[in-house]
Amino acid sequence: MLYDFVVKDAEYKDVSLSDYKGKVLLIVNGATGCGFTPQYDGLQKLYDKFQPEGFEILDFPSNQFLEQAPGTNEEIVGFCKLNFGVAFKQFSKIDVNGENEEPLYKYLKTQAEEYRNKETVELYEKLKQYTPGLEPNDIRWNFTKFLVDKGGNIVARFAPNVTPEEIEQHIIKLLRDDEIEIICHPDFSNGCL
């Protein structure tokens, strides 16, 4: 279960995910030098809007994709605060795939099929050259997002190009204890729309 994991924050202190029981969570593998880095702005807007209602964002920077999260934890946190006003929790830099994969991510990847929009297939085709040898459930790029309900269930996985604004409607439903429905498009056998 999600709440069984203990992770390191940006200051290398242990944080039990059980601290987030009863909250709606968005877990993301961020990066400071990626084309999707401006999503930090949208993420912060979601946080500002919904944090008072029990919403949290957990950012786990990863340098695995073209080394787009260079620098120390302190530098990454400083960059995000300075450029995007990030106030949500940022954790220690991790690997999301492979031999040194963070156990939390090993778990997350088994819990939900990825929601993709129409541009995702084209994006993944372009990224193939940079990510050879990935397993079917592996994270494909920075800013893959996992949405977690108040009970700790991973209810959705969103591709990197799915924006925070596209996820907002699902956050609202989970905060109201409504179920969300992710519609799988028949043209996408490897994902949902």
Identify the residue ranges that each predicted region occupies.
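N-terminal "domain-start" segment that seeds a small globular fold
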Residues: 1-18, 36-38, 115
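Conserved helix-turn-beta segment immediately C-terminal to the redox Cys motif
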Residues: 23-25, 32-61, 80-84
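Extracytoplasmic/secreted proteins, especially bacterial periplasmic and envelope-associated proteins
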Residues: 42-45, 75, 99, 103, ...
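Non-catalytic, surface beta->alpha helical segment in thiol-disulfide oxidoreductase systems
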Residues: 155-179
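A cross-taxon signal for low-complexity, glycine/charged-rich
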Residues: 190-193
